[in-house]
Amino acid sequence: MKSKFTFLKLFLGCISLLIISNKFISNAKGEELLKVELHNEIKKGKFLIGLKQYLGGENDSFSEKKNINFTTNKGFLNLISSNGIKHKSKQINITWADIPVKNPKTIERIVFGPFASYESAKKQSEKLRDKGFETTVAYPKNWEVWIPFQDDLPEFELKNKIFRKIKNFQITPVLRNDYSGMKLEGPIYIYSEEKIKINGVNFGKNFYLIRDLYGTWTLVQKIEFDDYLAGVLPYEIGPNSPLEALKAQAVIARTWGIFNSDRFNMDKYHLCISTQCQVYKPSKISNKNVQKAIEATSNLILTYGNQPINAFYHGSNGGVSATAGEAWQIQDYSYFNSIIDGSKSLNKIFKLPITNESYLNNFLDFDKEQFYGSNHSLFRWNKKISSLEIKEKLIKNKLININDDVLDLNSTERGSSGRVTKLEIQTNKVNKSIVLVKDDIRRVLNFIPSNLFTINKLSDDLWLLRGGGFGHGVGLSQAGAIEMAELGFSYEQILNHYYRDAKLENIELLSQ
């Protein structure tokens, strides 16, 4: 049963409001002042997507020349800068200049992290807020939590996490033509009635350049929900997936995007385009099945308690799904349960929780054809790892130094699905063991496809990991959804299978 309700009701108190600028000319005619509010764009059915991050800085890899070139085949491009500059032409070229600061200032903060995921960073942020700290969840390269620097730090350990940097210059965008350049101020709005190419790639019609927390810039695209999904589905589940699986993916990608639309509010946009959000690339060729799936589910999302759910999904669960609390250092959501993902007969053979390695080995050895999604290339996997490989990863993550050696590897805690939630790595340093928890296991040992594995010691410096699945294992398994669709399940049945007690709701967007 699908019901309707307005976005205003749905999001009352759910997503924080953030005004980008109250001096920003951004309607199609470029004549009216308009407040661009992240929350209001969502209510209108639009995402602000961070296409390219860290522009103008050391990590700017958008082009070799460190510039952005906007072109259009028809009509004109319009640029409006917050310092009053307006420009109209067939081509706009923006470069970056390091402008010296008259009064250099020292930036100081206390940094916690890195964290493997936004979810774990947000949980740390909440813990610090409960202690009275003002926090910011940021993503300079990895997820971090920042609190303001204080001379009188309440905990000694904080003194090891101080970040200091003197700001001598400011990265400034410059509008270039054949003869000169004009300094611009953000936000900068670039739009056209026709599609715009950026560095030779077709994107859309509405873009912003916005300064981020790190002194660099982000290229942001404003895009309708369904146009965004057309660039997500082909790269998340594949354009040739069965139609019902594509429909299920469309619903959860839309739901996930809405629920997580405050993920980058510190940098004044909603979502990124990498696996830290949902993989998005501009749609070059329209795929009929992808479009059918999006149109058939337009404005449909999954809700629980009249709010959108955090619709996690992944590649393969290896035959058993995880709870959110197994994957990240967060509280569980009631709509996620560990389930044996396959035929009903499997639930008679295997009972949850899977508490020990012997039971998990039996599970991994069982006939995989009875599970949904067993065709995935990593549904079952074996990985030999040496002490040297582990050591290299620990050094890279600054957990040990070059003189330390790895002696042993043990799982000390498992979740209800059998996934490792605590991994102890013993070293030759007296009383020195490294304990990796939940998503940090795969962040540090990133050669492990999932946390569903057993450990078998082959020699003093070699272990065999036997495992299943690819990804965190929470929510919909894309491989499972594809097989369920091939077996004749509808997208509603697929969603109900992976998100118990969640409701399919039809949202009503505010008028444009």
For the regions a language model picked out, list residue spans one by one.
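Conserved, single-site charged/polar hotspot
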Residues: 2-512
